[in-house]
Amino acid sequence: MCKHYHQAKFLLSCPSLKGCPPDQGYEVIFAGRSNAGKSRAINTLTLQNKLAKVSRTPGRTQHLVFFELDKDRRLADLPGYGYAKVPEHIKVKWYKDMNEYFNQRDCLRGAVLVMDVRHPLKPFDQMMLDWCNNIHLPTQIILTKSDKLKKIAASNTYFKVLDQIKKYSYVDVQLFSSLKKQGLKKLWTRLDTFFGYVD
């Protein structure tokens, strides 16, 4: 199953929705708060070290970045959200662009919401969940950096988040570690359903 993701390659980067690829095929978004480990998760998912650039300055990347799996399937890396040092006018633009993106892209097939296991379900995460839920978009929450916590603490956070998302349909959660490759096979399996690789 990993071969689909290992062949991912950079497609394009755009500052606004006008530059997005044609609204067709299968598109799965990766979204998360700045510094949640989103770029590293994408690199781990694709078994590549430098596909998604890891910024040393959280909130720096304000472009939508698309990675192509094949001519019909794409990963969309959304700008990191919720970082305090981002100017207010950029936050406002981000909110407007994301609202339009979620409501206008008919090709959306799934979402991966990336959350630091030590700081899950912050207000911006909740907003992303609501957007996904409003358009009935299947969603996988990955609690990254699980290696930073002891096993019991990580497990407790997992069950706490699982309980809090019961009100949402089509949402699942898992622990994930880019360092130890924890949860990688489960994420591949979930993405296979998003991309139509399995019935």
UniProtKB/Swiss-Prot annotation:
Family indicated by similarity: Belongs to the TRAFAC class TrmE-Era-EngA-EngB-Septin-like GTPase superfamily. EngB GTPase family.
Name of the protein in its database record: Probable GTP-binding protein EngB
Residues reported in the UniProt entry to bind GTP: 32-39, 59-63, 77-80, 144-147, 176-178
Purpose of the protein: Necessary for normal cell division and for the maintenance of normal septation.
Named cofactor requirement(s): Mg(2+)
Pfam families referenced in this protein's UniProt entry, alphabetically: MMR_HSR1
Residues covered by the EngB-type G domain: 24-197
Positions annotated to bind Mg(2+): S39, T61
GO BP terms, alphabetized: division septum assembly
Keyword line: Cell cycle, Cell division, GTP-binding, Magnesium, Metal-binding, Nucleotide-binding, Septation
A cellular component term, taken from the record's GO annotations: cytosol
